[in-house]
Amino acid sequence: MGFGFTGGAGHFINTQYENYATASDKKEGMIRVSGVVWLTNLDINKRHEDLILYKKYSAAEYPTYDNYDAINVDVTKDIPVDYKGAMGVPITFLDKFNPDQFEIVGLGQGNLYRELTPKGLSQKFVDDYYKAGGTGLIKEDHPILGYYDINGKATIPYMRIIIKNKKL
């Protein structure tokens, strides 16, 4: 397949492209792209390593979405060990995904979100989001997950993947 990316950055050569590489990577035509990950569905050993879960579910710590029956998990390492339902986890979860341990149910926004549920954001949630200083272009029935944080602030998390723990 080729070589993976080290250090979370990919380097590519394009002689027609202006040099924007970092000072340590100066080379004519070098393009440095940060935040690159290498994902595969090849059946390698790492793909079957269980993610060690240690946190217990607490309704106070894991808010539920306003428009989908799932809890929000802000950090992959904080996936609760004892929660049987659907969970919205960050996209960085894919780096730790074990198909023997978790089922990917769907995506938390856009057209793939509509495959999960026809229910978008409520008008009340949208109003609360903008009152709290939220930005962006959302409206009633927007196909994206939203929740109220522990302070009651309407929040739209960055892209979420909906998962379920297969072992519970």
Spans of features found by a protein language model:
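Class I S-adenosyl-L-methionine-dependent methyltransferase catalytic core
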Residues: M1-L168
